[in-house]
Amino acid sequence: ETKIIGDEIGKASALKMCYAAYSKGTTALLTAILATAESPGVRDELYRQWDSDDPNFSAQANRRTTRVTAKAWRFEGEMREISSTFEEAGLPNGFHQAAAEIYHRMAGFKDVAETPRLEDVLESILK
């Protein structure tokens, strides 16, 4: 559904960048958190902590991490665009630069027929 959000050029692009900054940016953050927890072997403890606050959070995080793998190669460029959008607004842009790197590391899953195992995704991030 097309919506008009104003007469000014660039408003729709800015909205798209802000929306993806959250939706795809938080998925990259969750993926990085899971990989970081995997490295010292505290992922199960993290799950217990998350699930004590929100009983389905760890399952949602796992699902979000694995379901983006086939499209992650596209998200790298989008995160770089978002980073530029933040910079143009006078805001720090490092988070989305890091998100671009997370998606870059997942690019090997492009066109994979089946959703990969979480452990395989985390291994690709930790390389």
Which residues fall in each region the model found?
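A short, charged helix-loop
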Residues: 1-9
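Short, surface-exposed, polar/charged, turn-prone segments marking secondary-structure boundaries
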Residues: 8, 31-33, 124
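Glycine-rich "substrate-gating" loop/helix at the edge of Rossmann-like oxidoreductase active sites
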Residues: 9-10, 21
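Helical "substrate-binding/catalytic lid" subdomain
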Residues: 15-115
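Short, basic/aromatic-enriched C-terminal tail that caps enzymatic domains
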Residues: 114-127
